[in-house]
């Protein structure tokens, strides 16, 4: 997968727009959000996308994101926080409550490094965002070699990141996949970041300018995934 659209269930998107996203050339979708996420909205969005053969990932930020029928679950593990709630605390609580029923083969953990200090998710998770390039590379190595996480996700959350940081962090990984998200608003930015990232995630621009969002995916339309 080279390109994923990230959809917020708390935001409305017409069915016609969803159809355009499905046929844009993207490789799949992430359903996830930080604020005002209701299970009914998650269910509706998942069902609207249900007819596509593209993979649909549910990113579990809280219990309202859990749909038992979903094919793929993403579990964020925030690496650059000192609040253990976001590294393993909430995870342990959920496993304690539902562990016997969790479809582990459909669950993938993703090591997050959040780098936009003004983002809601940074405030929520108490992320330490004033990191050097060396700090971020070290987190990449931590994700792969200590925690053995399958995904290392650098999240600039609405702000376009530094391609050089992405290049350095990606180069530090051998087996863990590098995902990049944040501020991609043009096909040129998509092409720039995908030179280094295994997968780019495009989100906010969907709700700001759909046509520009579609352009970020069309460059992948003829490529083999």
From Swiss-Prot:
Listed name of the protein: Heptaprenylglyceryl phosphate synthase
Gene behind the chain: pcrB
Organism this protein belongs to: Listeria monocytogenes serotype 4b (strain CLIP80459)
Top-level taxon of the source organism: Bacteria
Binding site for Mg(2+): 8, 34
InterPro entries: GGGP/HepGP_synthase_I (IPR039074), GGGP/HepGP_synthase_sf (IPR038597), GGGP_HepGP_synthase (IPR008205)
Key words of the record: Lipid biosynthesis, Lipid metabolism, Magnesium, Metal-binding, Phospholipid biosynthesis, Phospholipid metabolism, Transferase
Quaternary structure (record): Homodimer.
Residues that coordinate or bind sn-glycerol 1-phosphate: 6, 153-158, 183, 203-204
């Amino acid at each position: 997968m080279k390109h994923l659209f990230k959809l917020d269930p708390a935001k409305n998107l017409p069915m016609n727009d969803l159809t355009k996203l499905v046929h844009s050339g993207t490789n799949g979708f992430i359903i996830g959000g930080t604020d005002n996420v209701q299970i009914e909205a998650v269910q509706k969005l998942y069902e609207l996308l249900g007819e596509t053969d593209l993979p649909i990932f549910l990113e579990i930020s809280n219990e309202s994101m859990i749909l038992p029928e979903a094919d793929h679950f993403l579990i964020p593990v925030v690496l650059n926080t000192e609040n253990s709630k976001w590294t393993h605390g909430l995870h342990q609580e959920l496993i304690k409550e539902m562990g016997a029923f969790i479809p582990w083969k459909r669950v993938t953990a993703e090591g997050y490094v959040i780098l936009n200090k003004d983002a809601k998710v940074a405030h929520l998770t108490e992320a330490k965002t004033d990191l050097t390039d060396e700090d971020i590379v070290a987190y990449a190595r931590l994700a792969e070699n200590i925690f053995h996480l399958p995904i290392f996700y650098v999240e600039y959350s609405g702000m376009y990141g530094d391609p050089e940081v992405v290049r350095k962090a990606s180069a530090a990984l051998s087996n863990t996949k590098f995902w990049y998200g944040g501020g991609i608003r043009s096909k040129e930015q998509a092409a720039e970041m995908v030179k280094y990232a295994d997968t780019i995630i495009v989100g906010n621009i969907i709700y700001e300018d759909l046509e520009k969002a579609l352009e970020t995916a069309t460059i992948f339309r003829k490529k083999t995934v």
